[in-house]
């Protein structure tokens, strides 16, 4: 459980975070420079907010009014940095046990075995792979029995194959970890896979918070739609209570019920378009192909619209075979339920 109400003036903006999440697997998603890592540093006690309070798992870590500021070493937090912060002059074993008392050091062999590091325990960090370095960092953190885990872009330096395997290992570890884990990332896949709840931030402000799967399903804001992978976003204008115009695409879209007020844009995910051969009713787009990118398991079609802004249509393998057989469709169609209404 994370309860944050803090302000902190940074170079380009003021970080203002106010949230209360009743979950112990929390993700913070945002673009570069949005303030994600600063939130973790404040939780860990590395940085001090200008005002407010921080409470994690019921423990008050910081409160500017009550003059509470628990020292970083007393917060019992395990912090996994992007580069893992291994000491280059120490071996794998020495990196794990550094600063531990003799009783804790006796557990080192168990952690080496648990993380598959026994064979490289005498190697220096420059002699091990990125995946091995990630496991060393996790062993070093967990041997200290932290109450909370913080991950700051911890997997971003790994290639896709290694990242997938390390994340699977982390997910397995977290099943037995009773405390909270907070992940900062710009990777939507990582947040979706590992986090029950999430915060989306932009320039130091929260744009979305809540259940991870619900936010991906209905992001509600342009910022969240972009960060969760929506490639097609257009500003809109209302025509009437159930019709709007997508200004960037030059197309009118009809809805079966009254549209909510306050919508400024819509989004359509690239895989939510359906090809149409011949005449069709509903929300359709004229199909004028600009270019195509062939990928190993899918194709990306870039469609020229009347409004001037291209649309991306993602075509999976089964649909690729149909298009090869029938040729390009006459139109693209989108179901009303797949149109994201955004503020």
Model-derived regions: residue spans:
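Conserved ABC ATPase "signature" region
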Residues: 59-64, 105-120, 172
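A short, proline-enriched helix->beta-strand linker immediately N-terminal to the Walker B motif
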Residues: 143-147
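Catalytic Walker B motif of ABC-type/P-loop ATPase nucleotide-binding domains
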Residues: 149-153
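Internal alpha/beta loop-helix hairpins
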Residues: 185-249
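Conserved ABC ATPase signature
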Residues: 124-128, 132-134
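Non-catalytic connector elements of ABC transporters
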Residues: 4-38, 45-48, 60, 231-233, ...
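ABC ATPase NBD coupling module
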Residues: 61-79, 215
């Amino acid at each position: 459980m994370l309860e944050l109400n803090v302000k902190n003036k940074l170079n380009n903006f003021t970080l203002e975070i106010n949230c209360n999440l009743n979950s112990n697997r929390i993700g913070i998603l945002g673009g570069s420079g949005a303030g994600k890592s600063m939130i973790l540093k404040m939780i860990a006690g590395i940085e001090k907010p200008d005002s407010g309070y921080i409470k994690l798992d019921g423990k008050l870590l910081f409160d500017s009014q009550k003059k509470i500021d628990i020292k970083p070493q007393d917060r019992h937090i395990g912090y996994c940095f992007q580069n893992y912060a291994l000491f280059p002059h120490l071996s794998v074993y020495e990196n794990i046990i550094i600063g531990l008392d003799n009783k804790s050091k006796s557990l080192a062999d168990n952690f080496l075995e648990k993380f598959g590091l026994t064979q490289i325990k005498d190697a220096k960090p420059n002699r091990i792979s990125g995946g091995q370095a990630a496991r060393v960092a996790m062993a070093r953190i967990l041997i200290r029995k932290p109450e909370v885990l913080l991950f700051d872009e911890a997997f971003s330096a790994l290639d896709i194959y290694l990242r997938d395997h390390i994340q699977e290992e982390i997910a397995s570890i977290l099943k037995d970890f009773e405390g909270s884990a907070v992940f900062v990332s710009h990777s939507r896949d990582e947040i979706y896979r590992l986090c029950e709840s999430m915060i989306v931030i932009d320039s130091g402000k929260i744009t979305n918070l809540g259940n991870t799967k619900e936010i991906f399903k209905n992001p509600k804001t342009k910022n969240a739609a972009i960060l969760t992978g929506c490639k097609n976003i257009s500003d809109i204008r209302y025509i009437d209570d159930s019709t709007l115009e997508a200004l960037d695409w030059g197309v009118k879209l009809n809805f079966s019920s009254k549209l909510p007020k306050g919508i400024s844009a819509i989004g359509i995910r690239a895989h939510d378009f359906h090809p149409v051969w011949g005449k069709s009713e509903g929300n359709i787009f004229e199909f004028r192909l600009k270019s195509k990118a062939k990928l190993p398991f899918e194709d990306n079609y870039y469609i020229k619209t009347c409004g001037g802004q291209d649309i991306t249509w993602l075509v999976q393998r089964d649909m690729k075979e149909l298009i090869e057989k029938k040729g390009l469709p006459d139109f693209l169609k989108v179901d009303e339920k797949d149109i994201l209404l955004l503020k």
